[in-house]
Amino acid sequence: MKKKSVWIKADEGGWEEQKDRITTGLESGADCVLVNPGDVEKVRELGNITVAAFARDNKSRADIVVVGKRGEGDGTKPLPQEIPGSFDINAATLLMDKGVTVGGYVVIKDKHYEHFAAEMGKICDYLLVTGTDWKVIPLENLIADLQHQKVKIIFGVKSAEEARLAFQTLEAGADGVLLDSGNPQEIKDTIKAARELESESAELEAAVVTRVEPLGMGDRVCVDTCNLMQRGEGMLIGSQASGMFLVNSESDDSPYVAARPFRVNAGAVHSYIKIGEKTRYLSELRAGDPVTIVDSKGKQREGIVGRVKIESRPLMLIEAKARDRTLTAILQNAETIKLVGKDGTPISVAKLEKGDEVLVRLEEGARHFGKKIEETIIEK
C-alpha cells in the first residue's frame, strides 16, 4: 500500500479564506499545508500537520521550504540559459546543504519548464508541479524521467477527479497532489480518493470448515479501534501466517449485547493479524498502532487501535481447508464472535458447522519477524 499524500495549497487570499481550507484539510486528514512563510505559526496553532512554506530561506522554520514562487519556477523570472546559473536551483541546493527539507515548485508552461522541473527534481526532496492547462503528458514524462531519483512528485490539481487521474498516471502515479480548491467537499473527496488508492485489495477465497471444537479457558485479545466498521468488515486473523480467516467486527446487534462496530474480538494471544503487507501477533498490539480493516470483497482500509483488552475466556478451535491447505484459528467461544461467510454474511462461531464456507486469505512463503520470505515452513 503505497502512501499517497494530499497537500492543501493555502497561500492566496486573506487569512480567513486560507484558514477555512486548512481547517477542512486538518479535519479530513490532509498530509501537508502549503502557505506563505508568515502563516507558518498560525497553521501550527490550528493543529498538528506538516507545514510547507514558499520561501528561499528557513527563517519561518517550516517543515518543508518550497522554492520557486516569484522565481523561475512560476515564470516570474526567466528560465536560465544554463542550469548552474539557475536562481531557484542554487537556492534549493544551499538549503539542502544545510539539511533543510526542500521542495521545488514549477508551473509547466511549455517543454522548457518541463525540463527545468526535471532538473529541480534531481536535487529536491519534493517536486511540486502544476500546469496552466492541466494535462497528463507532462506528469507522465516527469514520472518516467525521475523514477530512479529519491524525489516525491506532487502534482497540482483543482478537484478530486483530477487527483484520481494524477494518482493513476502510469503504473506508479504521482506521490501526492497539491490541491488548490476552497471547496470543502473537493478537499474531503480528494483525501478520500487518496486513501482508497493507497489500499490494494486482499484476494479472499472460500475455505470449507472441517472442524469446530470447544476448548478450555485461555487468553484472548479484543481489539477496539478508533473506526466504525460495517457488516462484513473485520480483520484477517489466524494461527498460521500462511492463511488467515476474516473475523467480522461486532457490527451486528444480538439479544445479549448492543452492536460495537468499532470492535473485533480477534482471537487467542498467539494469533497473527495481517497489517498491510506484514503480520504481527495480536498480543503485541497497543493503542495508536495501525491495523488493516478488510471487507468481504477484499477492500482494505487503515484503522487505528484505540484499546486492546486481553482477558481469560472460553475458546474454540476452527479448522478449515482451502486448496490443499489446512488453516486454523482459535477464537472466543461466544455468539457475538463471527467469521464471514462465502456470500459476505457473518456466521457466528456458536452456529458454525462442518461444511460451512468462510472467507480466508492465503499467503505464499513464510514469515520472519512479520515479513514475507521465500522459505519452506510447516505450521500446524
UniProtKB/Swiss-Prot annotation:
Record's keyword terms, sorted: Amino-acid biosynthesis, Aromatic amino acid biosynthesis, NAD, Oxidoreductase
- Source domain of life is Archaea
Q: Does the keyword Isomerase apply?
A: no
Q: Which GO terms describe its biological process?
A: amino acid biosynthetic process; aromatic amino acid family biosynthetic process
UniProt EC number: 1.4.1.24
Question: Which InterPro entries does the UniProt entry name for this protein?
Answer: Aldolase_TIM (IPR013785), DHQ_synth (IPR002812)
List the catalytic activities from the record: 2-amino-2,3,7-trideoxy-D-lyxo-hept-6-ulosonate + NAD(+) + H2O = 3-dehydroquinate + NH4(+) + NADH + H(+)
One GO MF annotation is: dehydroquinate synthase activity
Q: Where does the signal sequence lie?
A: none
Indicate yes or no for the key word NAD. yes
Function recorded in the entry: Catalyzes the oxidative deamination and cyclization of 2-amino-3,7-dideoxy-D-threo-hept-6-ulosonic acid (ADH) to yield 3-dehydroquinate (DHQ), which is fed into the canonical shikimic pathway of aromatic amino acid biosynthesis.
The text of the family note is: Belongs to the archaeal-type DHQ synthase family.
What is the official name of this protein in its record? 3-dehydroquinate synthase
Q: Which gene encodes it?
A: aroB'
